[in-house]
Amino acid sequence: MSKARQAIPTVTFVDEYCRLYQDLFPDVRSFEHFKFLHVGMLSEIKRKTLPAIAKVAGDLDPQALHHFVVKAPWSVEELRTRRLTLLRQALAGRSFVLCIDETGDRKKGKTTEYVAHQYIGNLGKLANGIVSVNAYGILDHITFPLLFKVYKPRTRLQPGDTYKTKPQLAVELIQELQHWGFRFEVVLADSLYGERGDCIGFAPITSRPISRGCLRRVSGKS
């Protein structure tokens, strides 16, 4: 019986990190593409498109990366669970500052789900694009990603979707992190998330505003 080939090496720290997820991929090729995506996302290219990532990762076939993202048999949920589990272990119970922010990517056309003409915060203007609400942790001057949720405009809802405001998505992110057992004492967010009426969902998980409605002290303990 022939021995399975080893995955093509990339950057040492990328290889070491991705090895923690290797068992989640059914074959070596899928695992390699997982590593190549990390190399591309960490590179200095301005637009992290699949063709650009394929080029910077070693002149790969962009279609192969597209197949990995769209059709390869791996689970986003399993990957997210593994990542959050590893992060929780690394934190070892330490509290951090939780930052809620939104970001957007400009898109041409409306082929991609939930793309609409809407306000893109990081561009500071209305544009055609997709927006997400993101949760980051800050500890010892290190910023690390936690979770995100795509904002779904009313005009682009799919069958079975329920419209949720950005503050409502923020509440869901906080509650999910609490469910995971992450510990955080302060939530930083844009004033939008503390001043709008639809942010009443913060009530069960916040105690009092600290400043201008953009800082809130919460219980991040399970």
Language-model regions: role of each:
Residues K3-K71:
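Gly/serine-rich nucleotide phosphate-binding loop at the start of the catalytic core
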Residues L24, V39-S43, K55, G121-N122, ...:
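Short, charged/polar micro-motifs that form catalytic or ligand-binding hotspots
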Residues F36, I130-V133, Q168-Q175:
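Short, contiguous clusters of charged residues that form electrostatic/catalytic patches at enzyme active sites
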Residues I45, L79, A127, S191-E195, ...:
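Short, glycine/acidic-rich beta->alpha junctions
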Residues V69-T143, F148, K152-R154:
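Active-site-proximal, Lys/Arg-enriched surface segment
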